[in-house]
From Swiss-Prot:
Complexes and interactors: Forms a heteromeric complex with cardiotrophin-like cytokine CRLF1/CLF-1; the CRLF1-CLCF1 complex is a ligand for the ciliary neurotrophic factor receptor/CNTFR. The CRLF1-CLCF1 heterodimer binds SORL1 (via N-terminal ectodomain); within this complex, the interaction is mediated predominantly by the CRLF1 moiety. The tripartite signaling complex formed by CRLF1, CLCF1 and CNTFR also binds SORL1.
Protein species of origin: Homo sapiens
Annotated consequence of substituting R197L: In CISS2; heterozygous compound with a nonsense mutation; unable to bind CNTFR alpha
Highest taxon listed in the record's lineage: Eukaryota
Listed name of the protein: Cardiotrophin-like cytokine factor 1
Gene: CLCF1
Molecular function as annotated in GO: ciliary neurotrophic factor receptor binding; cytokine activity; growth factor activity; signaling receptor binding
Disease: Crisponi/Cold-induced sweating syndrome 2: An autosomal recessive disorder characterized by profuse sweating induced by cool surroundings (temperatures of 7 to 18 degrees Celsius). Patients manifest, in the neonatal period, orofacial weakness with impaired sucking and swallowing, resulting in poor feeding. Affected infants show a tendency to startle, with contractions of the facial muscles in response to tactile stimuli or during crying, trismus, abundant salivation, and opisthotonus. These features are referred to as Crisponi syndrome and can result in early death in infancy.
Similarity comment: family membership: Belongs to the IL-6 superfamily.
Annotated function: In complex with CRLF1, forms a heterodimeric neurotropic cytokine that plays a crucial role during neuronal development. Also stimulates B-cells. Binds to and activates the ILST/gp130 receptor.
Compartments reported by the entry: Secreted
Amino acid sequence: MDLRAGDSWGMLACLCTVLWHLPAVPALNRTGDPGPGPSIQKTYDLTRYLEHQLRSLAGTYLNYLGPPFNEPDFNPPRLGAETLPRATVDLEVWRSLNDKLRLTQNYEAYSHLLCYLRGLNRQAATAELRRSLAHFCTSLQGLLGSIAGVMAALGYPLPQPLPGTEPTWTPGPAHSDFLQKMDDFWLLKELQTWLWRSAKDFNRLKKKMQPPAAAVTLHLGAHGF
């Protein structure tokens, strides 16, 4: 079929109109369910915020403990903190964790750490320190709720503690002042490591759940061009 110049320009104008409106096309296919992505992003952002918040809290608390705990190169052995959940894990083991186990470990760790941190708050000697600890506990409780939201969005049940294993804090046997400070130091240290690991966990999960970029292909019969 012979296409004249006017017809060709008409088809070109039509094509330009279609291309102009392409950005609006994906909106027609949305179901209204954003999936777990926003919950995962929120949880990731919260872990980064808590990392920043903990740096301020730890500086204040370590100064309260005094030397050698507030010295930058102080790295004591872990003596009386065996009950704290450990964040450190072999890299290959960490990579092999499935999503459910990864989330479960985060939820259980913060349930225990929050309990111990509240105990720390109750024994803090100054009102300013108690306020700082209480504020951080509130933020950490928010992180727990956010992790629970991600698990619900992915269809995973919350871990149920076995009878008698619920995280509780009770004053242990009388420590020397130094050993008590050592326990407090390791609580903050382990919390710092968990927040660092959680940021890695949720960044990995965020990338995994990210939908592929929408691609639109136009099939044109370019007769006469």
